[in-house]
Amino acid sequence: MAESLAHIKYVERMAKYAETIPQNFVPSVMSADLPSYGQRTPKVINGYYPDLYYYDLHCVIIGEAKTTYDIENEHTQAQLDSYIREIRTYNCDKHIIICSSIIAFAQITNMVIRKKQRELIRDITFHVLDNHLRHKVI
C-alpha cells in the first residue's frame, strides 16, 4: 500500500489522469496502489511494483508517484529504466506517468526531457503531473 498521505494523493491524481489517455478506457484493467483497489499493482517489473498499471490491446500505462525527496536518485533512475525496458515490449501506445508535488514539477519535467534526449526515447509518451492540475506531456 501507499506509504504516505502525499503518496496516496499522487496515485489518486495519476489514476484520474490515466482515464483520459486511452481512447476507450476500460476501468477493470487498471490497478493502482490505493486503498480503494485493495492491493498493490500485481505487475512486477524487474522487482519494482509500479504505483499504477493499465493495459489493454491499444495502450499500456505505467505510473509512478514520487515524493519531493525521492526524485533524482539511483533508485528512481533504476525504476524508470526498468519501466522503459518493460513498456517497450508492448506493441501499442506506450505511456509513463510520473506524479509529484508542485515543488518538484519542474525538476521531474527537466529530468524526463534530459532522459528522452540522452537516450533517444521517441516511442514512449511521458506525462509529468503535479498534485494540483498542472501536467506536461513530453
Segments predicted by a language model, with ranges:
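Nucleic-acid nuclease catalytic cores
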Residues: 84-118
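Nuclease catalytic cores
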Residues: 1-15
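Charged, structured surface patches that assemble and position nucleic-acid processing machinery
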Residues: 112-138
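Conserved catalytic cores of phosphodiester-cleaving nucleases, focusing on short active-site segments
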Residues: 52-72, 83
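Structural motif
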Residues: 31, 66-67, 98-102
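Active-site metal-binding core of divalent-cation-utilizing nuclease and nuclease-like domains
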Residues: 2-3, 24-58
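Well-ordered, non-membrane alpha-helical segments in soluble/globular domains
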Residues: 9-12, 74-83, 107-113
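Mg2+/Mn2+-dependent nuclease catalytic core
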Residues: 68-92
